[in-house]
């Protein structure tokens, strides 16, 4: 795959209380939360998780909203509505080529597959599962639990009522929903310089430099929306959430992914990994930290701590965008 900067990597932690980060189906009137097993200290823990599929979906939703807010217009109806039906052109029909498909924002950044036409595009945005931080106390405290909810149908007669002429009653419909509470780690990788560039087919997409810069900015800013607004059942269980820590690495070189935020030493290990790689290839990069101490800079890796999220994202946008800020239609 061709090299096209910027390459952005992110990792961090967020706290979510009383949330349904990913639903996992139901048994009758019992709605379940997705769980998975992680290993720590030689022990297996079954923990609530936010799947990478769900995290990627929410990034695409917020990407489209941010992009339109910044004045972007090149997205089809599926992308506008947050429907993950990829591979459609701007008219909503199956695209005839990769170049045609990536005129649409969501196809471009989140990829697609049209098996009947043998057309595909790898996602430029890749995300991990979000799992509870791998510390014994947090893993033991991470929990999912069921809450009983009631719905009342005022028009449905009770079973004892035999005829319409008799007194009408109401019927209570009980269901249970699983929720979770924990501190979660996450990781993401975005090869944003390949926006608007066909990966597997010849041809021009018509995505100019200004449009490409707008898409890069939208993808980065969408991260701000992500960790306070993910999960299913949001109509009645908007997550009680906050971002605790965020680390963003940016380079003109295709750098390794950061160590997942679930690991206790993810910041130091990420800096160690990036330093080793950048020295080996003779390139440079920057790491921006929020909510956590940044390692010391060295001759290939600049490390900067941001006191606020605004400081972090202004610096990230300055580093990632061609010619710096701003990008707006």
UniProtKB/Swiss-Prot annotation:
Q: Name one GO biological process term.
A: defense response to virus
Pfam families xrefs: DevR
So which domain of life are we looking at? Archaea
**Function statement:** CRISPR (clustered regularly interspaced short palindromic repeat) is an adaptive immune system that provides protection against mobile genetic elements (viruses, transposable elements and conjugative plasmids). CRISPR clusters contain spacers, sequences complementary to antecedent mobile elements, and target invading nucleic acids. CRISPR clusters are transcribed and processed into CRISPR RNA (crRNA).
Which PANTHER family does this UniProt record tie to the protein? CRISPR-ASSOCIATED PROTEIN CAS7_CST2_DEVR (PTHR37459:SF1), PTHR37459
Q: Does the keyword 4Fe-4S apply?
A: no
NCBIfam families in alphabetical order: cas_MJ0381, DevR_archaea
The record's InterPro entries line, in alphabetical order, gives: Cas7/Cst2/DevR_sub_I-a/Apern, CRISPR-assoc_Cas7/Cst2/DevR, CRISPR-Cas7/Cst2/DevR
- Name-wise, this protein is CRISPR-associated protein Cas7/Cst2/DevR
UniProt keywords, alphabetically: Antiviral defense
Induction remark:
Repressed by 5 J/m2 ultraviolet light and 50 mM NaCl, slightly induced by 20 J/m2 ultraviolet light, 100 and 150 mM Nacl. Member of the csa5-cas7-cas5a-cas3-cas3'-cas8a2 operon.
How is this protein organized at the quaternary level? Answer: Can form a Cascade complex with Csa5, Cas5a, Cas3, Cas3' and Cas8a2.
Plastid found in the keyword field: no
Q: What protein family does this chain belong to?
A: Belongs to the CRISPR-associated protein Cas7/Cst2/DevR family. Subtype I-a/Apern subfamily.
Task: List the disulfide bonds in this chain.
Answer: none
